[in-house]
């Protein structure tokens, strides 16, 4: 992806970009009462480092370098209304998240980004081809809509795996299209994924099946009894 390639190029030029002239992790980060490392809510991005880790020169160098994503990522989000969030998870456990949602205050000190499904799916053991990985659709509590995550492995020029670039995308457009489809005079379309999870179902189709959105919300499996 373009965004993943941008992250790779930044890391390949880390020695030139890590000076902290634009943004300096050593000055910008502080510990919360939970011990998590946090940054100001007024900044463009959220930074999270687990509370059990110290802010080392290695952290500072990488964070200062990747802060240059501030110049491209907000514009990508603005140009793609269905994109909910863009983030980078590093192999050391650090997270840089757009937009700024005060991430460090939302997750526990032992939160391990490297164990998240989207990170694991793009990591070398699960993704030897180094291609983009797509999640199954899931219901997002914040937006109350279906989301998919695309994750892209980030390797530097030496071939070292540095982390995963992720993006959450809403499926609003496809659900609206399916909801507006008519089959014959009275029929309605609905959409399932390969695991029979509901992606889109209009109210009339729910009624035809004799079920309700509360019993079968989007993202849930439509069982054979239905």
Predicted regions and their residues:
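GAF sensory/regulatory domain recognition
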Residues: 18-42, 52, 89-104, 193-197, ...
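Intrinsic low-complexity, intrinsically disordered coil/linker regions enriched in small/polar
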Residues: 29-32, 173-226
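Flexible, glycine-rich phosphate/dinucleotide-binding loops
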Residues: 9, 94-95, 141, 198, ...
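Short amphipathic alpha-helical segments
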Residues: 66-74, 171, 175-178
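Short regulatory alpha-helical segment in sensory/regulatory domains of signaling proteins that mediates
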Residues: 4, 8, 73-81, 126, ...
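Juxtamembrane extracytoplasmic/periplasmic/luminal helical "stalk" adjacent to the first N-terminal
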Residues: 1-62, 78-82, 131-132
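Extracytoplasmic/periplasmic ligand-binding sensor regions of membrane-associated signaling proteins
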Residues: 77-172, 176
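Soluble or luminal CAZymes and related metallo-dependent hydrolases
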Residues: 61-69, 114
């Amino acid at each position: 992806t373009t965004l993943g390639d941008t992250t790779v190029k930044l890391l390949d030029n880390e020695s030139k970009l890590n000076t902290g002239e634009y943004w300096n992790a050593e000055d910008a980060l502080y510990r919360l009462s939970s011990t998590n490392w946090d940054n100001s809510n007024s900044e463009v991005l959220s930074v999270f480092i687990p509370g059990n880790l110290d802010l080392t020169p290695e952290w500072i160098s990488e964070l200062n370098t990747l802060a240059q994503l501030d110049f491209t990522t907000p514009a990508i989000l603005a140009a793609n209304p269905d994109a909910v969030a863009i983030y980078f998870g590093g192999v050391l456990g650090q997270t840089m998240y757009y937009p700024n949602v005060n991430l460090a205050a939302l997750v526990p000190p032992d939160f391990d980004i490297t164990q998240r499904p989207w990170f694991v799916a793009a990591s070398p053991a699960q993704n030897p081809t180094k291609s983009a990985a797509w999640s199954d659709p899931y219901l997002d509590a914040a937006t109350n809509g279906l989301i998919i995550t695309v994750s892209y492995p980030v390797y530097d020029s030496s071939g070292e795996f540095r982390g995963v670039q992720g993006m959450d995308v809403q499926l609003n457009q496809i659900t609206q299209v399916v909801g507006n489809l008519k089959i014959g005079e009275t029929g309605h379309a609905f959409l399932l994924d390969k695991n029979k999870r509901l992606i889109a179902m209009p109210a009339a189709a729910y009624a035809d099946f004799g079920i309700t959105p509360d019993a079968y919300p989007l993202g849930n499996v439509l069982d054979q009894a239905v």
